[in-house]
């Protein structure tokens, strides 16, 4: 989810950048202005910082960035992934993994160590609110892009 969500952030930056900087001449085929733009270039957009969008500084987007970067650059958010079992009367009731600890959207860190699970938050309990908030912000972002560009002519 986190890698795909981050890719969506990249794509939205490209779309917003193209719409904010439209092609003025179609006499030749030119490279898209957004071809080199990625999520890190969002600060160049007029929409950057817009409330309730993916461009607003918020914990959910920071968590997506942090977990995507951790997975891409370090392979996982836990060095030795563990699945925990809850057993009652010799029957497995639940299987779960723990979600890493965060401080203001960033992985909790102590002296270059980032893999802490002291909060005991289960992945399934954390993933649903992150997913819902991300898509709510994404929808608001797209609505703002459409509304802004409908008025630009």
In which residue ranges do the predicted regions lie?
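Acidic, Ser/Thr/Gly/Pro-rich intrinsically disordered interaction regions
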Residues: 14-153
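Alpha-helical repeat scaffolds in large eukaryotic proteins
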Residues: 6-13
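Extended HEAT/HEAT-like alpha-solenoid repeat tracts in very large eukaryotic scaffold/adaptor proteins
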Residues: 1-5
């Amino acid at each position: 989810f986190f890698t795909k969500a981050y890719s969506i952030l990249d794509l939205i930056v490209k779309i917003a950048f193209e719409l904010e900087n439209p092609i003025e001449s179609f006499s030749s085929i030119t490279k898209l202005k957004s071809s080199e733009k990625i999520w890190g270039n969002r600060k160049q957009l007029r929409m950057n910082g817009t409330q309730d969008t993916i461009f607003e500084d918020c914990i959910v987007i920071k968590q997506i960035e942090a977990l995507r970067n951790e997975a891409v650059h370090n392979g996982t958010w836990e060095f030795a992934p563990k699945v925990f079992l809850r057993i009652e009367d010799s029957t497995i009731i639940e299987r779960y993994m723990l979600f890493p600890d965060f401080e203001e959207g960033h992985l909790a860190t102590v002296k270059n160590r980032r893999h802490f699970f002291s909060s005991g938050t289960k992945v399934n309990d954390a993933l649903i609110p992150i997913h819902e908030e991300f898509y709510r912000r994404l929808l608001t972002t797209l609505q703002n892009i459409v509304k802004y560009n409908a008025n630009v002519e």
